[in-house]
Amino acid sequence: MPESVRHFRWSDIPEERVTDAISRKLITGDQMMLAHVYLKKDALVPQHSHHNEQLTYILEGALHFFIGANREREVIVRAGEVLHLPSNVPHEARALEDTLDVDIFSPPRQDWLDGTDNYFHKK
């Protein structure tokens, strides 16, 4: 394969513990990021926004999303469904059951790469 082409196996990617209830595995390209995010039932991803466009595809389980700065919209995304979040849209999510979600970001989430994603630890 040319040097710029890379092949990955999820089983070879280290799992990063984000909180007691959330962990993730990341694969990053030049212009996008692919993440497996594992959430235990009732895990909370606190409200945040980012300049990255996001696609969330639920492989197993379900997430209850609250969209907007004042939580104006609610969406439940279940296994086999996809949610598109444009850039800079405030959102939070709670796992309705143990969940595996696949997130795609463009460009890659620099805060996830350098550990500055402090919104996970807001009280």
Summary of predicted features, one role per range:
Residues 1-31, 35, 118-123:
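A short, N-terminal "cap"/entry segment at the start of jelly-roll beta-barrel domains
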Residues 59-60, 78-79, 97:
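A cytosolic small-molecule/anion-sensing beta-strand core signal
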